[in-house]
Amino acid sequence: LGGAILVFIFFGIVAGDTGMFSAYGVLNFLDVSANLGIIAIAAAMLMIGGEFDLSIGSMIGFAGICIAIPAIYWGWPLWMSIIFAFSMAILVGYFNGILVVKTGLPSFIVTLAMLFILRGATLAITRLITGRTQVPGLRVLIEDDPLAWIFATDTFKWVFTWLGSMNLIALRTDGTPLATGIPPSVIWFIALAIITTWILMKTRYGNWIFASGGDKNGANNVGVPVGRVKISLFIGTAVAATIFATIQVLDAGSADTMRGTLKELEAIAAAVVGGCLLTGGYGSAIGAAFGALIFGTVSMGIFYTDVDTDWFKVFLGAMMLIAVIFNNYIRRKVTESK
């Protein structure tokens, strides 16, 4: 939270007059933050449980194609294609989890392999069926679909219409508000942050997650179903990646085989900046949410200040390194005090 406040203050000073903190600008950086936050929260839950998922980014590309190809080339209703994509996500997540639990292999290795498998399969299948790496034409299928609106409809439009009528926010030349509503990614992000925080803080399953990541053997000895907990968390990261993919595919109106590249690293970085330990057993969903908010704000802040956007990656790496050093320092001090 402190880091997020400092970032807001900094860009309030250097970019306050650029439109970054107008209604439209705020929605822009909230949208970027929310998209990252959706997968960062799931990555944080898995990290608290003591594991990593490096296949999140590839799952985003794979899920997008699982929506686009059936809908465009096989004639499926869009809602059926979305359900198919989520079904495949559950299958991939379960496969990752069962491999880690049953073989004892490090999740780093298992999911790194899945990263290549999913990305390669996405490229090969898409080229085989379509002859290219992008699948356009989804936008016309969104209207009247009973499921797509959950991922593709801005909310609270009436609020922005009213604000525009009162001249409280920027308007287009035709008199309509520049900011038309809250993006679906923001709603999903807030909902996931609230639900996962409640799970971690208030439920037995949340206690199991902390126990599984903190001391797997000890948790097993007291009856915690560590294997099932870890498998469910891998399913969670795959499903979160599919939520991300569905929102992006329906917003862009097309699927791209390379979508989601390196997003797994950004998600892990946001979770670490939010306080998750790389060793497991400690962290929070709300911390990961603030980590994503920091990265989203910096990403758009760099754009608004006309700084070369390549510097965002430098910031990403520096923030993660500082967070890891700080987290290890705090952990060492806590251990010494005991």
Question: Which residues make up each language-model segment?
Answer:
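Hydrophobic alpha-helical segments embedded in the membrane of multi-pass proteins
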Residues: 32-42, 62, 94, 116, ...
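Alpha-helical transmembrane segments within multi-pass membrane transporters and channels
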Residues: 75-116, 290-291, 295
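Helix-loop-helix "hairpin" substructures at the membrane interface of multi-pass membrane proteins
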Residues: 77, 81-82, 91-96, 100, ...
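Loop-to-transmembrane alpha-helix initiation sites
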Residues: 107-109, 135-136, 181-189, 230, ...
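Transmembrane alpha-helical segments in multi-pass inner-membrane proteins
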Residues: 234-235, 241, 251-317
